[in-house]
Amino acid sequence: MLSPKKTRFRRQHRGRMKGLASRGNHISFGKYGLQALEPAWITSRQIEAGRRAMTRNARRGGKIWVRIFPDKPVTIRPAETRMGSGKGSPEFWVSVVKPGRILYEMDGVTKNVAKRAFGIAASKMPIRTQFIFSEIK
C-alpha cells in the first residue's frame, strides 16, 4: 500500500474540499484516463484495489500510471476513550481528490480494453468517475 516514507508532521487537520482540481486534471502520460467527478478522500487501500483490478484486466499489454498519492494521515481515537488527552494516532493514509482530478492513466491498449479496465477500477472507488481519452497521442 502507498504511504509517504517520511513526513514533516505526524498529524494533520481534516481540511475541506472546495472547488475543482486545478492541478492533475489533464492526461499527461497515457492516452486514456479515469477522472473524478466528486470530491472525496480516497484511501491507499482503494487506490491499490483499483490498480490491481486494472492490471488484471489489461493483462500483459499496456502501461498504467497512478496519478494520486495518499499523503494525508487520518487519525482515529481508540474506542471508548474519554475526551481530551490529545489527538488520536495515525491509522491510514488518504489522498484528497477534488472533481476533475485524474486518478489513473493507461496506454498501450485498445479503447475497449481501457474502458473495461477503468470500469472495474471505478467500481472500487467511493466516487463517481468518468472515462476520458486524449486526442493528441
UniProtKB/Swiss-Prot annotation:
One GO cellular component term noted in the UniProt record for this chain: plastid
Species: Cuscuta gronovii
UniProt record similarity statement: Belongs to the universal ribosomal protein uL16 family.
Pfam family, one: Ribosomal_L16
Protein name: Large ribosomal subunit protein uL16c
A biological process from GO: mitochondrial translation
Residues making up the signal peptide according to the UniProt record: none
Gene this protein is translated from: rpl16
Domain of life: Eukaryota
InterPro entries: Ribosomal_uL16, Ribosomal_uL16_bact-type, Ribosomal_uL16_CS, Ribosomal_uL16_dom, Ribosomal_uL16_sf
Molecular function terms, GO-annotated: rRNA binding; structural constituent of ribosome
